[in-house]
Structure formats: structure tokens, C-alpha cells
Amino acid sequence: MSWFITFEGPEGAGKTTQCALLAARLREAGYSLLVTREPGGTPLGETIREWLLAGEALRPETEALLFTAARAEHVWDRIRPALERGTIVLCDRYVDSTLAYQGAGRGLDEGWLRELHRIATGDLWPDLTILLDVPVEVGLARRRAAAATITRLDQEELAFHRRVRAWYHAAAQRDPQRWRVVDATLPPEVVADAVWATVTEVMKRGRRSP
């Protein structure tokens, strides 16, 4: 049984933490897992990640193309093979981050970004996307308080981050079958319980990856 589950949300929402907590529960339940992230997941992806998050500012088009190049390697080398083996794939960010950040945030055409995704991945979309929602100011304050490595995206103006969050809300409303919204302002253990309840409910319903 293969499932492709992604975590999305603004900065400081706790995606990496919740992805790890869900992975632990699924492993305890006996499932085979691939836990990965974007950008990253492959040697090329990790190299691109380091450049994109810490390097000099790039044109929005260049940024989007680099994210998509990393995703192409990631999908064809790791994600698709795992799904074909019947593995559950958990991914910390995926194409929706590109649509939110480079599309809504940077102002690139969403149709163009979707076409890039289609070409790069064979149009592979998640079965379930968990949106960990947190107000922009709260998320950025969490990042600062945790002394996390500050990336170029963290340093964007508040208006940029608000556009990103608004895109996520709109996407979840447009496709409620794929998206589930979880209040990420709650304590991590409460969020983890909500994520677990969501995943088990969706898996019980029977939507699977192609």
C-alpha cells in the first residue's frame, strides 16, 4: 500500500518536527517508510538546498527552476521507486511550496510553475497534504527563538509571508479531498495527535498513490 503524504506550511509551523513524529508512529505500526524533504532528498538536491537557502539572491525564475530541478531528481530517483515498492513516503515540503513561495510570494505565473512540475515529475501529486497553519508573526518568532539557521526566505518582508500563507489557505479550500489543515499554534504533542488522526482517517478511506 503506497501513500504519498506531504507537510506544508509557513515558516516556523513545525513541519520537520511533525513529519518525524508521524514517521515514528507509522514505524511503530509496522509500515515501511521513506522520510525525505525538499529541497533535498538526493545529493544534488542537498547541494541545491544549501545554495538556495543560504546563497545570494536569485531571480525568481532561476529560483523556481532550481527547486524544480532538485525535485525532478528527487521524484525519479527516490519517491517514485518507493511508491512502486508499496512504501509510504513522507515529504517535508513538495511542489505546493514552489506554488506558494515562488508563485504567490515571488509573483511567478502559477500555470507556468504547474507545467514545470508536470514535465519534471510526470505530474506526481501527493495523496494527502497536511497544512500546518500558524500566523506569520508567530512562525517567524518561533524561528528566531529556536535560534534556527536563518535563511533568505526567513528574511523576506512580512507581506511576502502573508501571501504565502494566503495561498496555502486558498489551496486547501479548493481541494479539501487532498488537503487537511491542522492548527499548529497548539503544543507539539497535540498537533501530533491531530496529524495522526488525520492520516489514519484518510488511509482508512482508501485513497492511494497511482
UniProtKB/Swiss-Prot annotation:
Name of protein: Thymidylate kinase
Keyword Nucleotide-binding attached: yes
HAMAP family xref list: Thymidylate_kinase
Organism: Thermomicrobium roseum (strain ATCC 27502 / DSM 5159 / P-2)
Annotated residues for binding of ATP: 9-16
Superkingdom of source: Bacteria
Family stated for the protein in its record: Belongs to the thymidylate kinase family.
InterPro entries for this protein: P-loop_NTPase, Thymidylate_kin-like_dom, Thymidylate_kin_CS, Thymidylate_kinase
EC number(s) from the headed UniProt entry: 2.7.4.9
Job description of the protein: Phosphorylation of dTMP to form dTDP in both de novo and salvage pathways of dTTP synthesis.
Catalytic activity: dTMP + ATP = dTDP + ADP
Keyword Nucleotide-binding: yes
Enzyme class: transferase
Encoding gene (name): tmk
Biological processes per GO annotation: dTDP biosynthetic process; dTTP biosynthetic process; dUDP biosynthetic process
GO cellular component: cytosol
Keywords: ATP-binding, Kinase, Nucleotide biosynthesis, Nucleotide-binding, Transferase
Molecular function, one GO term: dTMP kinase activity
Cross-referenced Pfam families: Thymidylate_kin (PF02223)
Cross-referenced Gene3D superfamilies: P-loop containing nucleotide triphosphate hydrolases
